[in-house]
Regions:
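Short, solvent-exposed aromatic-acidic interface loops
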Residues: 8, 54-57, 143-150
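Double-stranded beta-helix
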Residues: 34, 44-109
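Non-heme Fe(II)/2-oxoglutarate
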Residues: 101, 105-198
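A short, hydrophobic secondary-structure junction motif
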Residues: 27, 90, 131-134
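Short edge-strand/loop segments of extracellular domains
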Residues: 9-10, 54-59, 126-132
Length: 198
């Protein structure tokens, strides 16, 4: 299991959308390798996920055509290709409590939607088979360490990439988190289940 970050956009946010459509699976990995997703804590139709329907099927072809070969699990899709794929664009309407899953090869991005339209809060989730060869003992040790430290990771449970302690604030230090002021949740009754997932 990964310990993905969260996404929070307040209702008053007036940021404008940009094209940053991407695939979260490396060009040199063409098969279904990972389902990623989120649990939505708010209902959203404006500030939501945008997917490009069935693009997981052209993942290999797309990166070959663009002559892109790498092992990075985050690759931007060319802006002109995104515009040309407009008929495949699906802006998801997501009710509160929904679990949304997609193949990591799928071209996708979040959008802000109409200014000052709605609050958005989601918790990202991702699971991969525990018995995979890339899920080494070292990865398990790291996952336990980061779980105890309450750190978040990338979408991929392995190889594990830990995120910074502070959220992306784009220079606004007033949005930094003072972790000493937070109340720790008591999750003792869930620990055996958590240990099994880790």
């Amino acid at each position: 299991v990964s310990f993905d970050g969260s996404c929070y956009v307040d209702k008053e946010c007036k940021k404008k959308d940009a094209i940053w459509t991407h695939s979260d699976q490396a060009p040199n990995n063409n098969k279904l390798a990972c389902y990623q997703g989120f649990v939505s804590l708010t209902g959203n139709k404006e500030r939501t996920l945008v997917v490009y329907d069935k693009t997981h099927r052209i993942h290999n072809e797309y990166f070959k055509r663009r002559n892109i070969v790498n092992s990075k699990n985050w690759n931007l899709i060319d802006k002109h290709d995104v515009i040309n794929a407009g008929k495949l664009k699906r802006v998801l309407r997501v009710p509160a409590g929904a679990l949304v899953l997609w193949d990591s090869r799928t071209f996708h991005q979040n959008q802000y939607g109409a200014p000052a339209s709605e609050e958005r809060m989601v918790q990202y989730v991702c699971f991969l088979p525990k018995n995979h060869t890339k899920n080494t003992e070292q990865m398990s040790i790291k996952r336990r360490k980061y779980f105890k430290e309450r750190r978040t990771t990338s979408h991929w449970p392995y190889p594990l990439c830990v995120n910074a302690m502070q959220p992306r604030t784009f220079g606004d230090k007033t949005k930094n988190i003072d972790y000493t002021q937070l109340t720790q949740c008591n999750i003792d009754k869930y620990m055996s289940e958590i240990e099994n997932m880790i």
